[in-house]
Each structure stands twice: as C-alpha cells, then as structure tokens.
Amino acid sequence: MRVAERVIEDMRGREILTWPAVPIKLFHPIVFNFVLSLVPLFQFRGRVVQNIFLRRVGKYGIRKCLVEDLPSIISINWAALPEHYSDSFFEERLRESPETFLVAEDEKATIIGYIMCRIEYGFSHMKKYGLARKGHVVSVAVLEAHRGQGLGKALMEEALKGMRDRGCSETYLEVRVSNDAAITMYRNLAFQTVTTHHGYYRDGEDAYLMSKAL
C-alpha cells in the first residue's frame, strides 16, 4: 500500500477536537487536503512513520535512531569499523541517550551511517580538577561508498547538540592514532588531544583521547 493510501485509510472515521470542543472528522476535505500535503514527511516501512530530519546534507538526512534501525546500524558497525559491540550494548545506548544516537540515511531511506554516544558523570578532561557531566562519543561510522560527503561531521555536530540538551559541559572520544581522516575532522570540530592511551585497542594500537568543551 502506498503512503498516501495508508494515510487516507488511517484517517477514515477519526475525529479531532477543536476549541471549543467541537469534533471535526479527519476525513473532512479541508482537513484531508492539509494532512495529504504532509505526506512527504512520512515514510512507509510496514507502517507510517513520521520521518523528521534534524539536518539535510545533500541527498542525505540526519535523524534520531529508532529501535527498528538497530539491525542496520549493527551491520554498518561490522562493515566499517574494527571495534564491535553486542546487540544489547546498542540497545542500552539508545534507551539511555536517544538524543545522541543518530543515523544518516540516503534518498532511498537506507541507513548508511550512525553515531552512538553515552552520557557520563566523572572527572573532567578539560579542567585540572573537578567533575563534569560528559558526552562520550562511543562509535561513529559511515559506509565507505558514502564518505567524503560531510556526513561524519554532520553526525558529530548534531550529536553534540544532543549532549548540550542533556546538560553536558564537555565531550570526549577515543580515536586510533593511525586514523588521520578522523583526527583531522575532530580537530576541525575544536577537539584537543588530551593524552595517549597506549595499547588501547585489541590489536595493540594506541588511541588518542580527544576532548572539547560544549
């Protein structure tokens, strides 16, 4: 069933209340035409889902992650990164920090990238002493065929907004010392290298810990 047909079917027999409380049939022609004009905002995936993008990047869109997106995200994680996590880990991050778990999708609504973060409270990376509410960028990835479009930066910027909304005063991440492209992007976003974790990754490679104030 096409999106427009599904919207029409869902509207039949339903009412809304205006003020004063006067019921108006949703299938009233005026109301129907207004709702139909909103159809481009909807996407049919076995059901009608309102698809509101936080940002558009060319033919791509950045939006919050949905539970049904997780299988695609896990596949991207395995395809694009050497660091992998359990299914339950992804589920926990989405449940705990939905504002900072975002996806990028193309014009066919195929997910091609994501960013996953967590909100923490602990010692500050930006101050010599003291505690801070921090946003931790756990994992960010874009499929190789879609890189070079600014999607990684867009995902980062939108996730940082989510961290600010959650009251974080700073953010941090770990990155392989050999990942020049990612390091350059983070520096362009005003991240600073705080320290080096030697042998941080399972294969023995070192990691830079990078941080910035929000």
Residue spans for each PLM region:
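Conserved N-terminal entry element of GNAT/NAT acetyltransferase domains
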Residues: R2-E68
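Acetyl-CoA-dependent GNAT
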Residues: R55-R56, Y60, V67-A145, M156-R166, ...
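Conserved hydrophobic/aromatic "anchor" residues
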Residues: F90, Y114, M185, F191, ...
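Short beta-strand "wing" residues that participate in macromolecule-binding interfaces
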Residues: C117, T193-V194
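Residues at secondary-structure transition points
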Residues: K128-A132, G150, V177, Y201
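Conserved glycine-rich acetyl-CoA-binding loop
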Residues: S139-E157, R164-R166, E170, R176-T184, ...
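C-terminal "cap" of GNAT-fold acetyltransferases
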Residues: S169-Y172, R176-D180, L189-A190, G199-L214
